[in-house]
């Protein structure tokens, strides 16, 4: 069924991040978000990404997918629940004086995995 996996699925997104290096996550994850928002179907999220990225990125991917699935009323795949919280909090913006804001604003499915982003993290133009 590999050939049926959409190009911008979370499975393929994680493959691209691995291939291009973990610092490439923003480009690939935001491409996934755009594609999923345009066509929110389970096809984009049902195949678990290979667990070959850092725990930070796996938690970020799971939090992103879970939040978008809830927003669009798409079934949450079981692989998402298997991604554990980080042992240390990750402030994605990494700007010291904005940590308090991301503590306040971070959506619940990010926060529960120890990831702190701004409220507009998933907002795309």
List the predicted regions and their residue ranges.
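Charged, helix-prone or intrinsically disordered regulatory segments positioned adjacent to compact structured domains
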Residues: 2-81
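Charge-dense, extended regions
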Residues: 75-125
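Generic hydrophobic secondary-structure signal
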Residues: 1, 29, 33, 61, ...
């Amino acid at each position: 069924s590999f050939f049926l996996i959409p190009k911008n699925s979370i499975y393929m997104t994680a493959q691209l991040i691995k291939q291009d290096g973990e610092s490439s996550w923003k480009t690939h994850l935001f491409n996934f978000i755009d594609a999923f928002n345009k066509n929110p179907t389970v096809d984009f999220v049902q195949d678990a990404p290979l667990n070959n990225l850092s725990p930070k990125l796996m938690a970020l991917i799971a939090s992103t997918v879970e939040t978008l699935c809830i927003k669009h009323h798409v079934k949450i795949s079981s692989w998402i629940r298997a991604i554990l919280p980080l042992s240390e909090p990750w402030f994605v913006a990494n700007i010291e004086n904005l940590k308090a804001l991301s503590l306040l604003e971070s959506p619940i499915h990010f926060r529960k995995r120890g990831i702190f982003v701004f409220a507009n993290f998933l907002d795309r133009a």
